[in-house]
């Protein structure tokens, strides 16, 4: 039946959605620091804000999106997140100043559906295949990183930075279509409708000493990754005098 077929495809569809979103983000990382001629008011501070705006809104809204998906359904919140991601990509594609680019990146990040997608994956997969489904998501993110580091410099060199955001918006639209075609709202969702209980649970997560090591490790990993790919392209092109066309090969 269609429903059983869709259920089998859910892990693959969620992996594609993760991959599409991350591809659009990874393509930007190695080239944004080199776009000083593309945007007005470009400086080191505005560059850092533009890169960090996505993660800032993503981090703030991740838990609210998860709570709302418990109350209003996974599919609705995934739609909302992908629409925001697509709108943010369009805003960034049309940006001519760093302020506009920062706004676009912040809107992109406000579609904080990573947790909701993983919750949907847990809702629709049995315990036997759940680990494999999670591994599939990780594999697609890894492929997106590889492609993003390669395609980003190539697209920017030949077509311009705005084409990356246009491609990202297109991937957002494709993701919306995939959700409509293959994702059904799960019948059973683990819900906690008492807001005060939810807030207490969230507070305990922040102060859990065992989890704090994971929080710190993930924070340091992302900090070093973003810093590395922010500085390395500038070093390669300015200090070592490599052309931007060499960046895909080096990365």
Where are these regions (language model features)?
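Hydrophobic core of transmembrane alpha-helices in multi-pass small-molecule transporters
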Residues: 19, 88, 99-112
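C-terminal membrane-cytosol helix-exit motif in multi-pass small-molecule transporters
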Residues: 170-189
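Short amphipathic helix-loop junctions that connect adjacent transmembrane helices
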Residues: 30-44, 231-246
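Cytoplasmic helix-loop-helix junction between adjacent transmembrane helices
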Residues: 104-141
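Conserved MFS/SLC helix-loop-helix module at the cytosolic interface between two early adjacent transmembrane helices
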Residues: 60-96
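Pair of pore-lining "gating" transmembrane helices in MFS-fold secondary transporters
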Residues: 7-32, 210-227
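Juxtamembrane intracellular "pre-TM" segments in multi-pass secondary transporters
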Residues: 5, 184-216
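Residue-level signature of mid-helix packing/kink "hotspots" within the transmembrane helices
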Residues: 55-63, 145-146
């Amino acid at each position: 039946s269609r429903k059983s077929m869709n259920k089998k495809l859910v892990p693959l569809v969620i992996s594609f959605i993760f991959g599409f979103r991350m591809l659009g983000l990874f393509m930007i990382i190695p080239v944004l620091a080199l776009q000083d001629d593309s945007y007005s008011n470009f400086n080191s501070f505005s560059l850092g804000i533009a890169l960090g705006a996505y993660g800032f809104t993503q981090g703030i809204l991740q838990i609210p999106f998860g709570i709302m998906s418990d109350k209003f359904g996974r599919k609705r919140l995934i739609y909302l997140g992908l629409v925001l991601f697509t709108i943010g990509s369009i805003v960034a594609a049309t940006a001519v100043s760093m302020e506009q680019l920062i706004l676009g990146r912040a809107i992109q990040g406000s579609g904080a559906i990573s947790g909701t997608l993983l919750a949907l994956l847990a809702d629709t997969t049995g315990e036997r295949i759940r680990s494999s489904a999670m591994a599939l998501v990780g594999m697609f993110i890894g492929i997106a990183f590889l492609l993003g580091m390669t395609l980003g410099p190539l697209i920017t060199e030949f077509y311009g930075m705005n084409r990356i955001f246009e491609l990202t918006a297109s991937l957002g639209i494709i993701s919306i279509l995939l959700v409509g075609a293959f994702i059904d709202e799960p019948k059973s969702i683990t819900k906690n409708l008492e807001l005060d209980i939810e807030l207490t649970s969230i507070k305990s997560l922040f102060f859990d000493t065992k989890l704090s090591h994971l929080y710190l490790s993930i924070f340091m990993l992302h900090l070093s990754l973003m810093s590395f790919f922010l500085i390395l392209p500038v070093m390669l092109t300015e200090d070592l005098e490599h052309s931007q066309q060499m960046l895909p090969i080096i990365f």
